[in-house]
């Protein structure tokens, strides 16, 4: 019997924000079988920043993203020196 993959649940707390004139997408999601939420912030060039930490609530995840964007500013999220590239096969 083939096991079905769990569905991805997107939070209603996900949103788009503009910081220092740059648009960012705050994406908050979890697998339907999980209790904790994943936080991802995507900049205007499509670069994704995913938190290692999981969040007990989608509200906590959203607040963390907003606080980080406010404290660090848009440029900190757009620097290339803080990105770990995927390994090439």
Give the role of each language-model region:
Residues 1-4, 47-89:
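Mixed-charge, Lys/Arg-enriched low-complexity segments
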Residues 1-23, 85-86:
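Negatively charged, low-complexity tracts enriched in Asp/Glu with abundant Ser/Thr
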Residues 9, 17-19, 41-42, 50, ...:
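Extended aliphatic helical segments
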Residues 9-12, 45, 54:
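Intrinsic disorder/low-complexity detector
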Residues 25-27:
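A short linear hydrophobic-aromatic micro-motif
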């Amino acid at each position: 019997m083939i096991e079905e993959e769990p569905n991805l649940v997107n939070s209603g707390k996900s949103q788009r924000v503009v910081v220092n004139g740059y648009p960012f997408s705050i994406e908050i999601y979890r697998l339907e079988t999980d209790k904790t939420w994943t936080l991802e912030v995507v900049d205007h060039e499509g670069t994704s920043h995913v938190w290692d930490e999981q969040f007990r609530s989608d509200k906590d995840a959203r607040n963390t993203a907003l606080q980080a964007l406010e404290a660090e500013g848009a440029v900190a999220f757009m620097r290339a020196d803080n990105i770990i590239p995927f390994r090439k096969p």
